[in-house]
Amino acid sequence: IKLGAIIHGVGGNMSSWKHPDAIVDASVNFKYYKEQAQKAEAGKFDLLFIADGLYINEKSIPHFLNRFEPITILSALASVTSKIGLVGTLSTSYSEPFTVSRQFSSLDHISDGRAGWNVVTSPLEGSALNFNKKLEEHPDHPKRYRIASEYLQVSKGLWDSWEDDAFIRDKETGVFF
């Protein structure tokens, strides 16, 4: 069993931000994220999870309107934690494998191997509008999963395209490759 903690602003309730003890800007407050991450790590949680979505509407939880995206906040949290896994959501429907592979590879290097990816396919068709697409251009469920499968193959291929010691940086010989 792996134990994970999700940092979700002030929570998943529509009115949680109104509670007297709530930190109303928690979804964009690095100090809050840092404290939560360090508490989770001290509590022996295995991983920290940052969810994300690409579409909001009138039914969305208010603090989802303004929140950190996972890669940046997890990279920052890597510098203030040392053991806890760092898992972020990223959609295969509205991103490119090369860029995402670089982002997660960077997070993995920054965190000394603690990166994880929650792969999603963005089910809400309104997401298309945020990427200059028409609603009808949003892929249906089977197509999103075909895209995701190919996307993961490409990402894994990019990550496995060189060995850890493939790059030579030898000061004595002057070889930098």
Where are these regions (language model features)?
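Short, charge-rich binding segments
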Residues: 78-83, 108-110
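N-terminal beta1-alpha1-beta2 module of alpha/beta enzyme domains
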Residues: 1-81
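Hydrophobic faces of well-ordered beta-strands that scaffold small-molecule active sites
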Residues: 3-5, 48-50, 84-90, 113-119
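Internal, glycine-rich beta/alpha segment that forms the wall or movable "lid"
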Residues: 96-177
